[in-house]
Amino acid sequence: FTLNIPGPIKVFPLGEMTFEEGIRLIDSQLHAWKIPVLEKRTIRDFTGNEQFWSVKGDTLFIKEILCLLEDSLSFDIDVIRTDETKVSRTELGFPGRKCLLCSNDAFVCSRSRTHTVKELLDKACELMKDYFEEKQAKKLSSLSMQALLYEVSATPKPGLVDRNNTGAHKDMDIFTFEASAVSLNHYFEKFALCGMEKEHENGHEPFSRIFARLRSLGIQAEDAMMTATKGINTHKGLIFSLAILNCSLGYMYANHIPYSPDTLLSINRKLVADVLEDFKDITAETARTNGERLYALYGMK
């Protein structure tokens, strides 16, 4: 196993991350299918990292399960028989590898030098970056959903919904909260990806623009929640809070900003810097929510 990295530079941080992820994914497949691993060996060199497995099993079956991995990233996974012949994708009915940049056969593009090395390397790096950003977004989404489920499951909570009763609420129970949490899982991921997006090539996008995109996603999330709960507001406040939190964490990840609570809070503030503009014309009479009314009467934020 190695990576298909175009150009002379084969080893760099993002490539190293992808190489280690490839090893993890292949190990996981071999373990899941109970394929005995007799020996493993890693070779690290400036010409490119390589990982070898000596396994016991049906080579055609092993190639089949690894072909699905091969198509997900810039993985180059060869399965070699004991007679030193290589199992090809076409033996299993899989099409040849496609070019990273177009739908043509990769071998044809390579032979005719259809694309420049820079174009191919940029695309390979983009695929690797997108993979890890999506993985991080899914992790943040999972943690957000866990938080919602743990919160409603905490028992007892006098006056609030918990596992044993509905507290002061007559229109919702723990199942309402669970349905709401499930409906929001996909949006928590989108909130994180929103912070990772870069509308400008140099990456310096105003936080106000990011927040505008985030707000649109938040409205969609509220609609999904209301559909799941049949019109009951279970998590509207948490949608707002977790949208900001996940977006900020996504922004930090994509921009390689080391995590600290103070840094996270600073980015949160920058994201919502203009949100008070929404309240400048609100009065106690025109307020639509308790929060707006408290702001109009007492300036509570």
Stretches with model-predicted labels:
Residues 1-57, 173-199:
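Short, well-structured hydrophobic secondary-structure segments
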Residues 1-8, 28, 36-37, 44-47, ...:
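Anaerobic metallocofactor- and corrinoid-dependent redox/one-carbon enzyme cores
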Residues 1-33, 44, 66-74, 78-134:
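Long, contiguous binding/interaction regions
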Residues 11-12, 59-65, 257-263:
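Short, conserved charged micro-motifs
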Residues 51-68, 293-301:
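A contiguous pocket-lining binding segment that forms or flanks enzyme active sites
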Residues 75-79, 87-94, 226-253, 258-267, ...:
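Catalytic cofactor-binding cores of redox enzymes
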Residues 126, 130-204, 211, 249-301:
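Phosphate-rich cofactor/ligand-interacting catalytic cores and adjacent structured alpha/beta frameworks
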Residues 190-251:
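Long, hydrophobic/aromatic-enriched structural stretches that serve as scaffold segments
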